[in-house]
Amino acid sequence: MKTPLLVSHLLLISLTSCLGEFTWHRRYGHGVSEEDKGFGPIFEEQPINTIYPEESLEGKVSLNCRARASPFPVYKWRMNNGDVDLTNDRYSMVGGNLVINNPDKQKDAGIYYCLASNNYGMVRSTEATLSFGYLDPFPPEDRPEVKVKEGKGMVLLCDPPYHFPDDLSYRWLLNEFPVFITMDKRRFVSQTNGNLYIANVESSDRGNYSCFVSSPSITKSVFSKFIPLIPIPERTTKPYPADIVVQFKDIYTMMGQNVTLECFALGNPVPDIRWRKVLEPMPTTAEISTSGAVLKIFNIQLEDEGLYECEAENIRGKDKHQARIYVQAFPEWVEHINDTEVDIGSDLYWPCVATGKPIPTIRWLKNGYAYHKGELRLYDVTFENAGMYQCIAENAYGTIYANAELKILALAPTFEMNPMKKKILAAKGGRVIIECKPKAAPKPKFSWSKGTEWLVNSSRILIWEDGSLEINNITRNDGGIYTCFAENNRGKANSTGTLVITNPTRIILAPINADITVGENATMQCAASFDPSLDLTFVWSFNGYVIDFNKEITNIHYQRNFMLDANGELLIRNAQLKHAGRYTCTAQTIVDNSSASADLVVRGPPGPPGGLRIEDIRATSVALTWSRGSDNHSPISKYTIQTKTILSDDWKDAKTDPPIIEGNMESAKAVDLIPWMEYEFRVVATNTLGTGEPSIPSNRIKTDGAAPNVAPSDVGGGGGTNRELTITWAPLSREYHYGNNFGYIVAFKPFDGEEWKKVTVTNPDTGRYVHKDETMTPSTAFQVKVKAFNNKGDGPYSLIAVINSAQDAPSEAPTEVGVKVLSSSEISVHWKHVLEKIVESYQIRYWAGHDKEAAAHRVQVTSQEYSARLENLLPDTQYFIEVGACNSAGCGPSSDVIETFTRKAPPSQPPRIISSVRSGSRYIITWDHVVALSNESTVTGYKILYRPDGQHDGKLFSTHKHSIEVPIPRDGEYVVEVRAHSDGGDGVVSQVKISGVSTLSSGLLSLLLPSLGFLVFYSEF
């Protein structure tokens, strides 16, 4: 949406008088001289609306005004359209700034503006309001307590004290400062009135509440007396429907501002709040708070205007509220006035255009005083109209100023700044314009001479209104000295230049038309004759646009021949269809130019067909029509229709009717399509030079539905739980659904039965159906088959498959269940085999004593196994264990529960290796005894692993001593790992490296490297 425009023009015609009280024109005689560098005031800083806190300790306030001008400006202030009395001690000026000491609300509140002037004129600043801000304290009286039943909604009123301005922010204290309430879906503090809303009261809401009010404009905060809130307990809290109690009103806002809408509802349970813009999408800059109670629209635009709705809903009901946002716009310049110089006696068109909503009005100031309203036209104006002008656009929401200085020029003609060229070149037979542009006001009269001969207008010679001299059909005799004379009522002046005649530039070898195929090269020749005293350049253009040979993309295809003088030959390499068109060679000097053109035809594959339309949509075919594209100078031989379904990103050639679409056809059918499938279509054309670009794809269409014609595959099943028949199949992919309401019909009967039982499965993605029948005999053979259906009919049945119904779960529980505690983390469980043939596996369930049975872990073993090992158990922990027999139908009854305890954890301290000493052909490794902690298993011995460095396997020793002898390695390094052993398992490892070299290097003998090592167990240990 665009804001309306207001256009105002200042038209100055025949400027004729003087400036009045300003004297600058007197200094310069009859007008502004060329040396005049002065200018009127231009504001660099203007006063802004200011709020002075009544309780401020500063004791003064400043309103700023600063202008740039030459000479320096003089400043003056006005308040409520009266002059500010600067003789009063309370007022002072610092530069252009007004300083008010000890501001008084009764005397100083009002509207201020600044005037800045010098001898060029006066300008008036924007208006600024000085107001006095305050925030009174809350009344000292105590606030009564509030009692509310739990589950009911509640509002605590803030009732803020008297204040100015209105931009307050609100928070609520709970019991003490600075504990503030956090807003959520249940609690909301309105920033409109400050009230605290609780959707439904809970017992946790009990406490003392205080409304905390802040005024950011005067940086002051106050808070109310505390309000005791006492929730009344209820046996059961009754739900009640949503009730919107915080409602937003119709608002008018300004474009570019941020808008906040509040909406909060009481209700039990807490209502959910949703926002929408009625009949339109929400603004892209809209944000909804986490609680949902606040909608913020940032940088609102005109198109965001409209009706907004919030809806609150819980399980008991919903409530709605609507209000409208009206978006207005500050005035904004579309075109404004600028500093302007005009000749005395001339005309001026000075536009002033503003936009806004509502439409702004235009008024004018001259030298700070009201001058005119609306469109301003000035006739027959002189020096009196010079000065500072201000165009003011204003509506109900704002005012903008455009300032400009109007200078009146009055001076005798002078060529000092712009003399005639001393030497002018012109080609024989051509045309020349000799400019004559002196500075003069009013506009002078012009005359010309050649040598001693006065020139007058003729068929070849024309003196323009601006003083320029035009000569056509130039001959050698036109060469010579020319003088321009300019005269006005202020004086006269002249300027002289010499016209030199040169030979004309002519194309002597023009480019000729060419006809090529895509990928070939073409040469455009061009040569010219020219005056030898001048430099010649060639410029090539394509279809009216100059070819830029410096661009990398251009250099790929265009190349110029610089080898020959006066030759501008152009080579077009690897030409493409886009290079076909008109090429123009221009030979040019600084004096004249000559051009010649030729056409390049590039033959290639056809362009894309256009206007593709889809008609007569059926289940397996559609009719297509299109319009013929460009044949690119080679007749189209055939068309190809291509399709793409919603299930694929690839385009494929479609089968068509007729099978071959001749090049003179513009319609055909695509056949053998999939029913009830979404398709896109496109058409490509082919000629002898290749296949062209495809047409723009059609809109996506869906073919009509049809009954399925594909049967499900992989029909089978069996297994399941007691009294179940499980039937499975491979679901048909989406492309074979062929219609809406797709599903499956499952048919089954006992192997020797006569009558088929049929059931309907409506889920198109499922491939499984389970039939439950308490009378069904376990492990009974059934014949099954499946077919698909949709709203158009049924498809064919699949091949018949034979499956068995589920067998019964085992009926006996394992007996003689026993356990053996192996360590702190392992238990071995064993049981007696169940004799039933239908047992396929055993399941061991176990759980810790501090856990519930529902959290039990499970271990499954085959029916041939009668024991299992439980690992990763907690040390020193009570466990319960039971065993059950299972098959595909489920598990039978469990055994009696066995209670047992894991052993304490193994020692956590590694053995500290004291020494590693070589003695003859052996090493003696010695370590400290490991003492177990109170919650650890007692050390019963030590395990020593002797292995090559870098390998995990080695030789394992055990001992009750604190040392061991191991052989010296034959070659390389070995690692000796030592760990304590206990009933709870093996402890943490220590290790040392030993070497097989004759002299033991201290660097190879590392003392204790505590870590959790890789533990290798051997059955013989």
Swiss-Prot record:
Gene3D superfamilies named in the record: Immunoglobulins
Top-rank lineage group of the source organism: Eukaryota
Domain named Fibronectin type-III: residues: 608-706, 711-808, 813-908, 909-1002
Domain Ig-like C2-type: 41-131, 137-223, 241-326, 331-407, 413-500, 504-603
Region (Disordered): 695-719
Protein's membrane topology: Lipid-anchor; GPI-anchor
Signal peptide (from-to): 1-20
InterPro entries hit by this protein: Contactin-1_2_Ig1, Contactin-1_Ig1, Contactin-1_Ig3, Contactin-1_Ig6, FN3_dom, FN3_sf, Ig-like_dom, Ig-like_dom_sf
Lipid attachment site numbers (GPI-anchor amidated serine): 1001
One Pfam family recorded for the sequence: I-set
GO biological process terms on file: axon guidance; cell-cell adhesion; central nervous system myelin formation; cerebellum development; gene expression; locomotory behavior; myelination; neuron projection development
Keywords (A to Z) from UniProt: Cell adhesion, Cell membrane, Disulfide bond, Glycoprotein, GPI-anchor, Immunoglobulin domain, Lipoprotein, Membrane, Notch signaling pathway, Repeat, Signal
Tissues/organs with expression: Expressed by neurons, oligodendrocytes and their progenitors (at protein level). Myelination regulates the expression being down-regulated when neurons are in contact with Schwann cells.
GO MF annotation list: carbohydrate binding; cell-cell adhesion mediator activity
Protein's cellular compartments: Cell membrane
Residues listed as glycosylation sites in the UniProt record: 208, 258, 338, 457, 473, 494, 521, 593, 935
Assigned GO CC terms: axon; glutamatergic synapse; plasma membrane; postsynaptic membrane; presynaptic membrane; side of membrane; synapse
Residue span(s) of the pro-peptide: 1002-1021
Disulfide linkage: 65-114, 158-211, 263-310, 352-391, 436-484, 526-585
Subunit annotation: Monomer. Interacts with NOTCH1. Interacts with CNTNAP1 in cis form and TNR. Binds to the carbonic-anhydrase like domain of PTPRZ1. Detected in a complex with NRCAM and PTPRB. Interacts with TASOR.
Family to which this protein belongs: Belongs to the immunoglobulin superfamily. Contactin family.
Function: Contactins mediate cell surface interactions during nervous system development. Involved in the formation of paranodal axo-glial junctions in myelinated peripheral nerves and in the signaling between axons and myelinating glial cells via its association with CNTNAP1. Participates in oligodendrocytes generation by acting as a ligand of NOTCH1. Its association with NOTCH1 promotes NOTCH1 activation through the released notch intracellular domain (NICD) and subsequent translocation to the nucleus. Interaction with TNR induces a repulsion of neurons and an inhibition of neurite outgrowth.
Name the record gives this protein: Contactin-1
Organism whose genome encodes this protein: Rattus norvegicus (Rat)
